[in-house]
């Protein structure tokens, strides 16, 4: 099945300043620990109790670091963590970047990440990682 969750953007004036809504969170899918954040580093709009993203990469707390903020799609491995920015889907704020989204195929032993650029049926970027290779 599919799993959908979200974290608010830093300029989401309703949800980001609301302590009842997680600005950053950890989830687990098929044994992969995933950290979700809008920004890849701390932001001046953060709440006092927000997790600092800088402390997550390479700490062993997450296998996947999923972030946005820059609107630039990318997939890279950093200090044993797969870092993914799906890009953006907001046509009214292109910031010079094409419309993109990420598809994560997660199995207990393997992760395949595809970045699709719209319009288009094929991935622009596709990378596969074995969980055992991240350690």
Region spans (language model):
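Short, flexible loop segments at the rims of nucleotide/cofactor-binding pockets, characterized by
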Residues: 12-16, 39-45, 62
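Active-site-proximal loop/helix segment associated with metal-binding centers of metalloenzymes
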Residues: 30-32, 93, 132-135
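Short, surface-exposed beta-strand-loop junctions and turns on beta-sheet-rich folds
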Residues: 42-43, 90, 119-122
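Core dinuclear metal-dependent hydrolase active-site scaffold
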Residues: 26-37, 41, 104
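Core catalytic region of metal-dependent phosphoesterases/phosphodiesterases
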Residues: 1-31
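Conserved beta-sheet core of the metallophosphoesterase superfamily
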Residues: 5-6, 45-114
């Amino acid at each position: 099945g599919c799993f959908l969750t979200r974290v608010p953007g830093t300029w989401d004036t309703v949800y980001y300043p609301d302590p009842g809504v997680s600005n950053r969170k950890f989830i687990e899918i098929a044994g992969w620990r995933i950290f979700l954040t809008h920004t890849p580093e701390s932001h001046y709009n953060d709440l006092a109790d927000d997790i600092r993203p800088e402390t997550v990469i390479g700490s062993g707390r997450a296998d996947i670091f999923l972030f946005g903020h820059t609107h630039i799609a990318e997939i890279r491995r950093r200090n044993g963590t797969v870092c993914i920015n799906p890009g953006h889907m907001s046509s009214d704020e292109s910031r010079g970047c094409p419309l993109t989204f990420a598809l994560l195929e997660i199995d207990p032993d393997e992760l395949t990440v595809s970045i699709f650029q719209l319009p288009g049926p094929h991935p622009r970027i596709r990378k596969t990682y074995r969980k055992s290779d991240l350690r």
